[in-house]
């Protein structure tokens, strides 16, 4: 997809795509070592919940290019209905994280791989729902 087409997409559409990218990445990552399905599911849910995504967005910020930081900012400011059970700031950061991944999936798969690796490293060292070092 060319840059003009990507920019024509709504931030919600990019977040929709980014949600799928992140979930598939996490599901692939948790497959090894082999475990029961319930453990795979539990590990996946811990990593893809909004609070974990919001922490990743915060931790990624210093590693982003100017353009990526702009996509993250735009994603955070996107409209949308916040689920009642979530803090609005957490939801918006999680949406920003997903929008960034959606953008990178369409625009730069190599860079997406770098960002996903950074996310994996953070979650490996700190756990999916551990407060970020900056918090």
Swiss-Prot record:
Gene3D superfamilies: Ribonuclease III domain. Keywords: Cytoplasm, Endonuclease, Hydrolase, Magnesium, Nuclease, Ribosome biogenesis, RNA-binding, rRNA processing, rRNA-binding. Its cofactor is Mg(2+). GO terms for biological process: rRNA processing. GO terms for cellular component: cytoplasm. It is found in: Cytoplasm. Its main location: cytoplasm. Homodimer. This is Mini-ribonuclease 3. It comes from Gloeobacter violaceus (strain ATCC 29082 / PCC 7421).
């Amino acid at each position: 997809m060319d840059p003009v087409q990507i920019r024509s997409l709504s931030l919600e559409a990019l977040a929709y795509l980014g949600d799928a990218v992140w979930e598939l990445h996490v599901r692939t990552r948790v497959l090894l070592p082999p475990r029961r399905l319930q453990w795979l599911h539990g590990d996946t849910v811990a990593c893809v919940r909004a609070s974990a995504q919001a922490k990743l967005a915060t931790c990624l910020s210093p590693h982003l290019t100017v353009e990526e930081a702009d996509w993250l900012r735009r994603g955070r400011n996107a409209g949308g209905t916040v689920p009642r059970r979530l803090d609005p700031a957490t939801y918006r950061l999680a949406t920003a994280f997903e929008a960034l991944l959606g953008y990178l999936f369409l625009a730069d798969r190599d860079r997406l791989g770098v960002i996903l690796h950074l996310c994996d490293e953070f979650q490996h060292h700190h756990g999916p729902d551990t407060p970020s070092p900056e918090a």
